[in-house]
UniProtKB/Swiss-Prot annotation:
HAMAP family in the record: RibP_PPkinase_B
Family: Belongs to the ribose-phosphate pyrophosphokinase family. Class I subfamily.
Cofactor comment text: Binds 2 Mg(2+) ions per subunit.
Phylogenetic lineage: Bacteria, Bacillati, Cyanobacteriota, Cyanophyceae, Synechococcales
The protein's name in its UniProt record: Ribose-phosphate pyrophosphokinase
Alphabetized PROSITE patterns for the sequence: PRPP_SYNTHASE
Binding site for D-ribose 5-phosphate: R213, D237, D241, T242, G243, G244, T245
Binding site for ATP: D55, G56, E57
Pfam families: Pribosyl_synth, Pribosyltran_N
Cofactor requirements of the protein: Mg(2+)
């Protein structure tokens, strides 16, 4: 995708870590993405030690002075969710005790986001609990991408900048010579997301799959609301976990006469048996995701396309550091 920050602007702004006191540090959940963000900004991924003791306890040490610095900690809380969340909390505490001026948690994938409300008695709202933990640990700001529900921003008592992976997905799809596009929401809850995506796809028509969930990680697709016959169907969701929802939707779209089916999602959780389901012959022409979560080699398959969101995250970090608008990136 086109770089948000041109070389000319970088020169004009004199973007250097020494003069701007911008510091990046990554945990262990997605170091590859952190390196790409650091390269985009022209600052190093700072030195730190993250290790585990024999009893399972985590240890973090920041290995350079960050006193008075604007610190960004890059750590999606993907699997193993609890370890990566705890590591992030320890990193925040270490930076706070090292007298960082401001600490921003960059969480491209926000674990526990699906536990955003009670669906039965005596349940925890774990998305809110996670937000409380981040705030209490000493975070000043959170930068997240494609939260499962936008209302999670309100769980934080600190600023939360919410950005979207859709421009990266749309830029890629625009190069694929697609015709007769229809954007499909895999469930009623994703209609707002699908409608916004369809608008970016030159106001493509919208279809909805009516789905009834029968249990955790289980879903049953019932019917398609809208016309998909003879069209290229783009199934859009925020994440793909086990693949049950989106694969059931794809089968239904094929039955309804869709000539091509492409799956798009920001977050590739890919819990087993997602890869086997998604790679089934003839189901998807492509499965397009981003690198918000690292994908292990054994979970890749021929139809998979992984796009980088490093430039987008890097630009958002730069704008936060410069105290300029983040939302204007998406206007």
């Amino acid at each position: 995708m086109t770089s948000f920050l041109t070389a000319a602007r970088a020169e004009q702004e004199k973007l250097t870590p020494d003069t701007r006191r911008l510091r990046l540090f990554s945990g262990t959940s997605n170091p590859g993405l952190a390196r790409e963000i650091a390269a985009y900004l022209g600052v190093p991924d700072g030195p730190r030690v993250c290790k585990r003791f024999a009893d399972g306890e985590l240890y973090v040490q920041i290995q350079e002075s960050i006193r008075g610095c604007d610190v960004f900690l890059i750590q999606p809380t993907c699997a193993p969710v609890n370890d990566h969340l705890m590591e992030l909390l320890i990193m925040v505490d270490a930076c706070r005790r090292a007298s960082a001026r401001q600490i921003t948690a960059v969480v491209p994938y926000y674990g526990y986001a699906r536990a955003d409300r009670k669906t039965a008695g005596r349940e925890s709202i774990t998305a809110k609990l996670t937000a409380n933990l981040l705030v209490k640990s000493g975070v000043d700001r959170v930068l997240a991408m494609d939260l499962h529900s936008a209302q999670i921003q309100g769980y934080f008592d600190i600023p939360c900048d919410h950005i979207y992976g859709s421009p990266v997905l749309v830029d890629y799809l625009s190069t694929q010579n697609l015709d007769d596009i229809v954007v499909v929401s895999p469930d009623v809850g994703g209609v707002a997301r699908a409608r916004a995506f369809a608008k970016q796809m030159n106001d493509a028509p919208l279809a909805i799959i009516d789905k009834r969930r029968t249990g955790h990680n289980l879903a049953e697709s019932l019917t398609v609301i809208g016309d998909v016959s003879g069209r290229t169907a783009i199934l859009i969701d925020d994440m793909i976990d086990t693949g049950g929802t989106i694969c059931a939707g794809a089968r239904l779209l094929r039955q309804q006469g869709a000539k091509r089916v492409i799956a798009c999602a920001t977050h590739a959780v890919f819990s087993p048996p997602a890869s086997e389901r998604l790679s089934a012959d003839g189901l998807f022409e492509q499965v397009v995701v981003t690198n918000s979560i690292p994908i292990q080699q054994e979970r890749t398959f021929p139809q998979l396309q992984v796009l980088s969101v490093a430039n987008m995250l890097g630009e958002a970090i730069w704008r936060i550091h410069e105290e300029s608008s983040v939302s204007s990136m998406f206007r």
